[in-house]
Amino acid sequence: MLRRKVLWAASALVARGARLLGNNTDYDAEISEWRKNYDRDLRSEKGPLWLIGRHNVPEGRTEIGSDSSQTIALPARAPKRVGAIERRGDKVTFEPTRGIAVKVNGKPMSGSFALKTGVMPNPGDKLEFGDFEIALSASDGNYQLTVRDRQSPYLKTFQGSLWFPVNTGYLVEAAFAPYPTPKELKIPDTTGRTRTRQAPGNVTFRLNGETLRLEPVAIGDGLFFMFKDRTSGRETYGAGRYLESEKPKNGKVVLDFNKAYNPYCAFNPYSSCPIPPKQNTLITRVEAGEKYRGGH
């Protein structure tokens, strides 16, 4: 979800003035290219369409495979007994079942070996077998295993994103007001956890005759916006959408709602997605960016 900042960086400085002045030919081409890159991200192995499961991993032994006796059940295409995770505190090992070929980060492994755990939402070591990949991550003592599948039903049935028509009226310049010190935001996610993020300031802008305000969080050298509006739960995803921008320059930020996109949770029920804070609910319809096809 915080992954697309590079998609707008290359052309943003050159195109900003042309966009705001209404150079639609260049702008339409840019949006088209952005959407192609976005679609490629969704279909990639790190995207949401490969994800088919998220499981808690308690202390002790957790067996993995397609057999109904396994703690974590995989699709029937997987081996009946892939192996077992052994967790003792923050020490995690994996022992494959004899005869099952597994790789860790692309390297063949055998016998019992340690697994590096990532910090949510970033996974640790990638364990591969057949069409499947599993990885372990942890946060506040909670360990979770994600399962990815090259033949995921979400990937096979994905028809591409739906979009509002490109509209330069939703390309706006906002005034950025920095906070004296970054403000801590408590951001809940769709798995029930709450994370603390830093808001460097807020932005105000005019849209559809309204003066609106959003509070972003800092990501890298840019800003990340989580928002809802009056299309949420109707034409767009009910939990809200995301938007990224460059960092403020001369007290201004360009917001391009034609690049508003859905959280990963819009594509499968297993992703962990931050939920927009209440103050980021806009009292207008943002008829720009990605729509929601439905499905879960």
Predicted regions and their residues:
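Forkhead-associated
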Residues: 51, 56-124
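An exposed acidic His-Trp-rich patch
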Residues: 106-119, 211-259
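N-terminal pre-domain segments of enzymes
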Residues: 21-55
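Surface-exposed beta-loop interaction hotspot
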Residues: 132-194
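Extended, aromatic/histidine-rich regions of cofactor-dependent oxidoreductases associated
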Residues: 160, 230-235, 246, 252-296
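Broad, structure-driven detector of short, well-ordered beta-strand segments within folded domains
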Residues: 83-87, 132-138, 174, 212-216
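Flexible, glycine-rich surface segments
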Residues: 175-231, 237
